[in-house]
Amino acid sequence: MDLIGFGYAALVTIGSVLGYKRRGGVPSLIAGLSVGLLAGYGAYRVSNDRRDVKVSLFTAFFLATIMGVRFKRSKKVMPAGLVAGLSLMMILRLVLLLL
């Protein structure tokens, strides 16, 4: 079972709900829940086959790119820098699973 992947998905999902409660942005909530569900699906696939990282890798790369750009613009570590950093660590972990 890919506990790290499921934890990453849970953090993204919970973060989107907390961000919605704080700021009230419905598009951010929908995007965050969608990415969280996609990350959860990717973790499920990795749980069944450790080399099936395509969905998880795509999701982490997408989130790292989006949040990396937001971090570069805003210079705020929370939440953009934190999510970009976690996504980069997920990418590294997934690539290492392929080796």
UniProtKB/Swiss-Prot annotation:
Gene3D superfamilies the record matches: 6.10.250.1330, Transmembrane protein 14-like
Transmembrane segments: 1-21, 24-44, 79-99
Short name of one Pfam family: Tmemb_14
Subcellular location, record wording: Mitochondrion membrane; Endoplasmic reticulum membrane
Keyword DNA damage applies: no
Keywords (A to Z) from UniProt: Endoplasmic reticulum, Membrane, Mitochondrion, Transmembrane, Transmembrane helix
GO cellular component, one term: mitochondrial membrane
GO biological process: negative regulation of apoptotic process; negative regulation of mitochondrial outer membrane permeabilization involved in apoptotic signaling pathway
Topology versus the membrane: Multi-pass membrane protein
Main location: mitochondrion
Keyword field contains Plastid: no
Known role: Inhibits apoptosis via negative regulation of the mitochondrial outer membrane permeabilization involved in apoptotic signaling pathway.
Family: Belongs to the TMEM14 family.
Name assigned to this protein: Transmembrane protein 14A
